[in-house]
């Protein structure tokens, strides 16, 4: 967890060192967040999601269960 940040990562999920995760974001079961991924504030990352290096998830967005967000993909704010 980044110093001063307030977000939730389920114990079965893993966020690599260097991943940028915004305040209020929740990362659920069996997810893997790569070290160069960026996730905005207030997001929900569903179960079994993979977010690759270089992928961006905007603020207040939701990634549904079993989705992969691949390198270079960018989701804007408020995407569901």
Residue ranges: model-predicted function:
Residues 2-11:
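Extreme N-terminal tail/first-helix region
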Residues 10-11, 16-17, 22-23, 28-29, ...:
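Left-handed beta-helix
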């Amino acid at each position: 967890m980044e110093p001063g940040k307030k977000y939730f990562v389920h114990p079965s999920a893993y966020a690599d060192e260097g991943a940028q995760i915004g305040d209020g974001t929740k990362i659920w079961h069996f997810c893997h967040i790569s070290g160069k991924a960026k996730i905005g504030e207030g997001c929900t990352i569903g179960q079994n999601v993979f977010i690759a290096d270089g992928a961006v998830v905007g603020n207040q967005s939701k990634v549904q269960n079993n989705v992969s967000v691949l390198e270079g993909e960018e989701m804007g704010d408020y995407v569901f």
